[in-house]
Amino acid sequence: MGTNQTQISDEYVTGNSSGVGGGISDVYGEDSATLDQLVTPWVTSVASGYTLMRDPRYNKGLAFTDKERDAHYITGLLPPVVLSQDVQERKVMHNLRQYTVPLQRYMALMDLQERNERLFYKLLIDNVEELLPVVYTPTVGEACQKYGSIYRRPQGLYISLKEKGKILEVLKNWPQRGIQVIVVTDGERILGLGDLGCQGMGIPVGKLSLYTALGGIRPSACLPITIDVGTNNEKLLNNEFYIGLKQKRANGEEYAEFLQEFMCAVKQNYGEKVLVQFEDFANHHAFELLSKYCSSHLVFNDDIQGTASVVLAGLIAAQKVLGKSLADHTFLFLGAGEAGTGIAELIALKISKETGKPIDETRKKIWLVDSKGLIVSERKESLQHFKQPWAHDHKPVKELLAAVNAIKPTVLIGTSGVGKTFTKEVVEAMATLNEKPLILALSNPTSQAECTAEEAYTWTKGRAIFASGSPFDPVQYDGKKFTPGQANNCYIFPGLGLGLIMSGAIRVRDDMLLAASEALASQVTEENFANGLIYPPFANIRKISANIAASVGAKTYELGLASNLPRPKDLVKMAESCMYSPVYRNFR
């Protein structure tokens, strides 16, 4: 071969077939190798040093040693200094903190991910509390709105109506074969921002970066997908920079057939055990897809099930503060879409299992308000099917404040996607009814939150137990510091995904979501409670995810839905051993 190239041999494949690092075959020996063992960084059958530096999986930037530079023909292509990964991390964080605009930070991080994958994930893991609002909510919402303008390089797989009849061929274009997790969106309901069409790709990309950083699933096992069936957003259709199909959304039979082809192709290409997470689909499609495919595929809807699980975890944890069981509470929701009804159903299921009462009876303690007012029996015939179980006997009530005074809830939960709907009068009414009102303003992004942390603490005179969907800064009130909790799905889905992969699950069941909720609630300490928190700090997220994965895995084995046999003796250790490490490897 030429002097500037390296010949690859078939002997490079190492590691056992079961694999670690997120449950896929360890093709490059990167995770089965200890940190001081050498791995071979070949990208293609013949790779030059120049190519090596431009592959984000293997690029180490200025961390290539002199020996590695000589061996892989990099000498002279980099400045002479050799920097450790820790120094590189400090440098990048210093540069990120110079940006005052969150979107600029987001773009800088995405650029890093496309240049140096391991440094990106090390940065995210070590600085999760600071960077989580950048790579995900709330900043990712703005990134999706402006995705056409900031688009640089393709991330993920785009499957549009133009590919109808050949989706399997498109899936085979993706270079990685051992896919374990797919996050897919059709962009119709991105956060609280509505129909962003093809520009919703930022959501699957962001979610999967968190599957890796927080749950330890290997980046090469993750596949972000956007299904482009058009958009009804006129601004995007008239925007010359829009990157998707410029046509109205397909619906009805055309939509159903396209999704059917997609789901069949996924199963055919990646097998029975690939986890498909539906993300930010509109209500009418989200419930239908989950119901249709839950018995034939390993599917999960984060908006319905992930949100439900994380909220239930907060409610379980809050029992220690309030001294009440879930069955003692009365719940009132503002918002009766995917999130609201999903949370309500999981709460009802948990109470049913605790009390032995039928779920139809436990639902009666849970009330929902939609855009037309309180959901009551006389509205049942006109309600969408997923709202009908929540239509209880009561006279019609139009306004939220009137509903609070009529129902007298102990817990107020906002999933409306409409900001400032928990008004001063509503929050003060909750404080009048309860010594410690539990208020969850869950809508994302921050601008769509039903109320702010400061408003909740001020209007209840510091008595509220508060959590939100997007982050809020600590609040000083009456000489005391209150730290608002964040009911972020990121607590649940990375550990849940790892648990499903680790056990070789073939289906997702509600009992697994309950197990995840209980595992998360168990991680809240007395110190957290003293600071007003009902969720643990994100700084411990990998430990939290390992515990959730172990609980989900245990439940999967218990239900007979696990295929990785025999069951490991210590599931927590198994989860920790499966986690991807972003530390640089030494190359031969």
UniProtKB/Swiss-Prot annotation:
Divalent metal cations. Prefers magnesium or manganese. It is found in: Cytoplasm. The modification N-acetylglycine is found at residue 2. One of its GO terms (molecular function) is NAD binding. The record marks 303 as: Important for activity. GO terms for cellular component: cytosol; plastid. The active site is at residues 136, 207. Its EC number is 1.1.1.40. Its cofactor is Mg(2+); Mn(2+). Optimum pH is 7.7. It holds the Pfam family Malic_M. A divalent metal cation binds at residues 279-280, 303. Slightly activated by succinate and aspartate. Repressed by fumarate, malate, oxaloacetate and glucose. Belongs to the malic enzymes family. Homohexamers and homooctamers. This is NADP-dependent malic enzyme 3. It comes from Arabidopsis thaliana (Mouse-ear cress). The lineage of its organism: Eukaryota, Viridiplantae, Streptophyta, Embryophyta, Tracheophyta. The gene is NADP-ME3.
